[in-house]
Amino acid sequence: MASTKLFFSVITVMMLIAMASEMVNGSAFTVWSGPGCNNRAERYSKCGCSAIHQKGGYDFSYTGQTAALYNQAGCSGVAHTRFGSSARACNPFGWKSIFIQC
């Protein structure tokens, strides 16, 4: 009985560690004020919708979570662009919000 409880406790801890490490290594969207991929940078990696403040260039680092970019605030309307892999462009863009699917 004690060995069964220990076994399930160990399995539970291992699952929690795996889930926590997945959250730490989530996809991330970095934007710069510009020109290009220079000057002030902001990074977005939380699940759900985030407002984009810098628009000089971007880098999306894909690690399993896809993202949708919107031309409207609040991730409203139809997604203009979707990322399912890493992408980078050091040119100005007009997206106003990003939704990272977790």
Swiss-Prot record:
Transmembrane segments: none annotated. It is found in: Secreted. Pfam families: MiAMP1. GO terms for biological process: defense response to bacterium; defense response to fungus; killing of cells of another organism; negative regulation of growth. Disulfide bonds join 37-90, 47-102, 49-75. Keywords: Antibiotic, Antimicrobial, Disulfide bond, Fungicide, Plant defense, Secreted, Signal. The keyword Repeat does not apply. Residues 1-26 form the signal peptide. One of its GO terms (cellular component) is extracellular region. It comes from the Eukaryota. InterPro entries: Antimic/Inh_G_crystallin-like, Antimicrobial_MiAMP1, G_crystallin-like. Its main location: secreted. Antimicrobial peptide which inhibits the growth of a variety of fungi, oomycetes, Gram-positive bacterial phytopatogenes and S.cerevisiae in vitro. No activity against E.coli. Its antimicrobial activity is diminished by calcium and potassium chloride salts. This is Antimicrobial peptide 1. It comes from Macadamia integrifolia.
